């Protein structure tokens, strides 16, 4: 480990994403695991983070004290729950460190809290940390801008594993936001999340969402542009959860020397149009 290696905290360290992050940090030059945090009461508290991740002992015990874990760290990687991520954002702001948030299912109130924390922390937040999905979102925005809403309907279809607890997925919403941006509309005013029973005709100009859950699917997303006599489908399939971990670590390194603010993966990847 070099003296200038970025010292990262992994929260939710005992989960599948947490373990993937620990393994990848261990294998990535320029990064070092500073601390690993699990929820209070977890059976993994006190155990070696490396052993949990299948690396063997690395001398980092899992803790349930994020405040001490953030002390002297350079950044935190966070794929947890909305309420927990809000708490971590406040702590990251106090510590003036990087906070990469891959948590999905956040409310408007949560987003307001993240914006407040970003006055002092460098926050990178995205519904998906992968390069492919973020490139897809740019293509979706361009297609939505080019195809007249009177002639083309937009539907977002997603499937995830049976353990996922929020719907639509953060990635589906990211793609919906891209489509809405391309059309110059507000997604909240034009999205259709549920169809059941006698729904009547499809509302003109709406953006529909369909959610599937089952098996061990890591993440499949399609945006369908349905016109008269033709259909355009833009899609992405994730086959390995480590792609999200790689993106999160790329975001942390990118944000290290940035000024406080709320950024997205489009900023990290140089795809932002703002």
From Swiss-Prot:
Species this protein is from: Rhizobium rhizogenes (strain K84 / ATCC BAA-868)
Q: Tell me the residue numbers annotated for binding NADP(+).
A: 39
Q: What is its EC number?
A: 1.17.1.8
Record pathway: Amino-acid biosynthesis; L-lysine biosynthesis via DAP pathway; (S)-tetrahydrodipicolinate from L-aspartate: step 4/4
Q: Which PROSITE patterns match?
A: DAPB
> Which family is this sequence assigned to?
Belongs to the DapB family.
The name on file for this protein is 4-hydroxy-tetrahydrodipicolinate reductase
Key word NADP present: yes
Alphabetical GO biological process terms: diaminopimelate biosynthetic process; lysine biosynthetic process via diaminopimelate
- State its role: Catalyzes the conversion of 4-hydroxy-tetrahydrodipicolinate (HTPA) to tetrahydrodipicolinate.
Amino acids binding (S)-2,3,4,5-tetrahydrodipicolinate: 161, 170-171
Tell me the residue numbers annotated for binding NAD(+): 12-17, 102-104, 126-129
Task: Kindly identify the residues recorded as the active site.
Answer: 160 (proton donor/acceptor), 164 (proton donor)
Q: Which UniProt keywords apply?
A: Amino-acid biosynthesis, Cytoplasm, Diaminopimelate biosynthesis, Lysine biosynthesis, NAD, NADP, Oxidoreductase
């Amino acid at each position: 480990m070099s003296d200038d290696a970025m010292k990262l905290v992994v929260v939710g360290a005992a989960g599948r994403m947490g373990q993937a992050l620990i393994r990848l940090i261990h294998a990535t030059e320029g990064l070092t695991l500073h601390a690993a945090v699990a929820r209070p009461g977890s059976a993994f508290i006190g155990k070696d983070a490396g052993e949990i991740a299948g690396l063997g002992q690395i001398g980092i015990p899992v803790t349930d004290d994020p405040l001490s874990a953030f002390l002297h760290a350079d950044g935190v990687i966070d794929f947890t729950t909305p309420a927990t991520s809000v708490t971590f954002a406040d702590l990251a702001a106090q510590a003036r460190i990087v906070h990469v948030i891959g948590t999905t299912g956040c409310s408007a109130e949560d987003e307001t809290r993240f914006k407040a924390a970003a006055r002092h922390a460098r926050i990178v937040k995205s519904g998906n940390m992968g390069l492919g999905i973020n490139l897809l979102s740019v293509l979706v925005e361009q297609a939505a801008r080019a195809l007249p809403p009177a002639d083309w309907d937009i539907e977002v279809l997603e499937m995830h594993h049976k353990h996922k607890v929020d719907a639509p997925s953060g990635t589906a919403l990211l793609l919906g936001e891209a489509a809405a941006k391309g059309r110059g509309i507000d997604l909240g005013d034009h999205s259709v999340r549920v169809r059941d029973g006698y729904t009547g005709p499809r509302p003109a100009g709406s953006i529909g969402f369909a959610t599937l859950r089952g098996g061990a699917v890591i993440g499949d997303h399609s945006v369908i542009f349905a016109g008269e006599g033709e259909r355009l489908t833009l899609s992405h399939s994730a086959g390995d959860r480590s792609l999200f971990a790689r993106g999160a670590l790329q975001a942390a390194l990118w944000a290290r020397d940035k000024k406080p603010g709320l950024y997205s993966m489009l900023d990290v990847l140089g795809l932002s149009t703002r």
